[in-house]
Amino acid sequence: MIPMQHGLILAAILFTLGLTGLLIRRNLIFMLISLEVMINSAALAWVVAGSHWGHPDGQIFYLLAITLAAAEASIGLALLLQLYRRHHTLNIDILSEMRG
């Protein structure tokens, strides 16, 4: 069995990588992938904690995280398609420009 500290350290590293990718990248596809990594790292922390204490709650929260990630991906991809159709780019900075 993997010690709890190792699983939580791995989850923290993955969350940090996802947060870094979310803050640094300006492409919407990379931002969605980074957000998925962050959601999965939080779910990993729940599973590790649940397996350490012998409760199935971590696995239940993992199922919740999977459904949340699926909803986030579908909404994000719909926004991505609309952004590309209107502006012919996937750069998120285009959305912050004001029309005048």
Curated annotation (Swiss-Prot):
Family annotation (InterPro entries): NADH_UbQ_OxRdtase_chain4L/K, NUOK/Mnh_C1-like
Broad EC category: translocase
EC number per UniProt: 7.1.1.-
Keyword Cell membrane among UniProt keywords: yes
Cellular component aspect of the GO annotation: NADH dehydrogenase complex; plasma membrane
Top-level taxon of the source organism: Bacteria
A Pfam family matched in the record: Oxidored_q2
Chief location of this protein within or outside the cell: membrane
Substrates-to-products reaction catalysed: a quinone + NADH + 5 H(+)(in) = a quinol + NAD(+) + 4 H(+)(out)
Localisation per UniProt entry: Cell membrane
Molecular-function GO terms, alphabetical: NADH:ubiquinone reductase (non-electrogenic) activity; quinone binding
Keyword NAD appears in the UniProt entry: yes
A GO BP entry: ATP synthesis coupled electron transport
Keywords: Cell membrane, Membrane, NAD, Quinone, Translocase, Transmembrane, Transmembrane helix, Transport, Ubiquinone
TM ranges: 4-24, 28-48, 60-80
Membrane topology (UniProt): Multi-pass membrane protein
Classification via NCBIfam families: PRK05715.1-1 (NF004319), PRK05715.1-2 (NF004320)
Annotated function: NDH-1 shuttles electrons from NADH, via FMN and iron-sulfur (Fe-S) centers, to quinones in the respiratory chain. The immediate electron acceptor for the enzyme in this species is believed to be ubiquinone. Couples the redox reaction to proton translocation (for every two electrons transferred, four hydrogen ions are translocated across the cytoplasmic membrane), and thus conserves the redox energy in a proton gradient.
Quaternary structure note: NDH-1 is composed of 13 different subunits. Subunits NuoA, H, J, K, L, M, N constitute the membrane sector of the complex.
Family: Belongs to the complex I subunit 4L family.
Protein's recorded name: NADH-quinone oxidoreductase subunit K
